[in-house]
Amino acid sequence: MRTSSNTEYLVKKAYKRMWLVRRLKGLGASTSQLVDALQKQVLSVLWLGAPAWFCQITEQERKDIDRVAKVGLRIIFGRFYSGFENALLAAQMRKPTEQLAGMTERFAAKAASSNKFSKWFQPERKKTIDTRNSKNSQKYENVPARTARYGQSPIPHLTNIINSK
């Protein structure tokens, strides 16, 4: 499955669940209840398998993912909506793409320390002697990629995330 069709499917599924927020708003739910429903019922759909595909999505797909939250916040705040950034602050939320990036970083750290998945990452071979002035900054060997598509795949991306910390 290509990431574009996967992202399209997840965004469509999230929009289909937006009726719940509209319905709760019509029934008079409080803002905190509406934000909770948005996060748990609508945006949670977007997190499905995120560490595997988030590194490969395009800028347009990132905008589509953020737009789901934007629509949800617009429904919640109604006429008091004064922009996406202000609505995020009022709802005490982060952009979905920022949450996905954080989720991917946490997944990489946990996978590297796991007995089962640590085999995904090859330890860096010592090329020089560590001295006070020159420390080996990378923890894991970079994954060689002959094509750009493989370079953006999950294992090289997760390795780069761990090495950049």
Where are the regions a protein language model picked out?
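Charged boundary/loop elements
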Residues: 47-62, 66, 75-78, 82, ...
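Non-catalytic, peripheral interaction segments enriched in hydrophobic/basic residues
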Residues: 1-112
